[in-house]
């Protein structure tokens, strides 16, 4: 919930289906969960749940539109590859979370972790992670077009 739904970090919901043994889940929760839950975290979950119940479709359409815009702009810079739905082939890739903006960076001569560090240290932009050849930025309901523009501009300058 905190990544995509707008609740505070460290908050989460556990959703179970009919095939999950409720007693076993309760046993594991009792081993790992505190008896003094944070009312701040629980309140943030409730507010986020309410917001998504009332406006979730609209909100996620806006996030998806921002992500697609970012993907197009990053690919237009040159040297980066922000991949998307074109990877879905029905054999090995069946779907794609468009809110996760994964960008290949090696063609600009920098490893993903280097771009990650530059974004953080020089542009004050914190993304999810960088590895040997990619960075991952996760767009959520808390992001605005302004943040997307900052990311795209920073990547253009880094190139």
Q: Where does each model-flagged region fall?
A:
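Structural signature of PLP-dependent enzymes
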Residues: 48-71, 147
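Short, flexible helix-coil linker/hinge segments at the edges of structured domains or between repeats
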Residues: 10, 17-23, 27-29, 77-88
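Hydrophobic residues within well-ordered, non-membrane alpha-helices that form the packing/core
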Residues: 29, 49-52, 74, 155
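Short, contiguous, pocket-lining structural segments
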Residues: 4-6, 33-41, 58-62, 66, ...
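Short beta-alpha connecting loops at secondary-structure transitions
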Residues: 26-32, 55-56
